[in-house]
């Protein structure tokens, strides 16, 4: 009985919401509102636009560092291990690799946005 009452209430509520949606006035449809958004590029324009290689390199660098930072997320759970010295050594090694990668990227002027 309880399940059937719940189902009938859900169906009645859904039908009520559908009827209200049909009675509400339709909003103006703008063509720009319904066109696809492609990261600031015109989707109906030419697909052969020049692409900024600097933007691509910064995006790839962000993805690499983001994935490496995700490797640090299990550290609080890893700190409960019995071999704490090995865990801390591995965490320090990972952070050192991240710092070395950041220093290399900085020295190669990969983080500067100048044309």
Swiss-Prot record:
Main function: Core subunit of the mitochondrial membrane respiratory chain NADH dehydrogenase (Complex I) which catalyzes electron transfer from NADH through the respiratory chain, using ubiquinone as an electron acceptor. Essential for the catalytic activity of complex I.
Q: How does it assemble?
A: Core subunit of respiratory chain NADH dehydrogenase (Complex I) which is composed of 45 different subunits. Interacts with TMEM186. Interacts with TMEM242.
The record, for Gene3D superfamilies, names: NADH:ubiquinone/plastoquinone oxidoreductase, chain 3
Domain of life according to the entry = Eukaryota
Name of the gene: MT-ND3
Listed under GO biological process in this entry are: mitochondrial electron transport, NADH to ubiquinone
- The set of disulfide-linked cysteines is none
Instruction: Give, as one word, the top-level EC class.
Output: translocase
Name the Pfam families on file. Oxidored_q4 (PF00507)
Transmembrane segments annotated in the record for this chain: 5-25, 55-75, 86-106
Which species expresses this protein natively? Avahi cleesei
Specify the taxonomic lineage.
Answer: Eukaryota, Metazoa, Chordata, Craniata, Vertebrata
Q: What is its main location?
A: mitochondrion
- What's the protein here called? NADH-ubiquinone oxidoreductase chain 3
What membrane topology was assigned to this protein in its record? Multi-pass membrane protein
Under Gene Ontology molecular function, one entry of this record is: NADH dehydrogenase (ubiquinone) activity
């Amino acid at each position: 009985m309880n399940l059937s009452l719940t189902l009938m209430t859900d169906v009645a509520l859904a039908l009520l919401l559908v009827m209200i949606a049909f009675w509400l006035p339709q909003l103006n449809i703008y063509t720009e509102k319904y066109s696809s958004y492609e990261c600031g590029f015109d989707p109906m324009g030419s697909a052969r636009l020049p692409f900024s290689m600097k933007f691509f390199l910064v995006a790839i660098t962000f993805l690499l560092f983001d994935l490496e930072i995700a490797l640090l997320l299990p550290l609080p759970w890893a700190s409960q291990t019995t071999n704490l010295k090995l865990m801390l050594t591995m965490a320090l090694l990972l952070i050192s690799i991240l710092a070395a990668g950041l220093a290399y990227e900085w020295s190669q002027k990969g983080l500067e946005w100048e044309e």
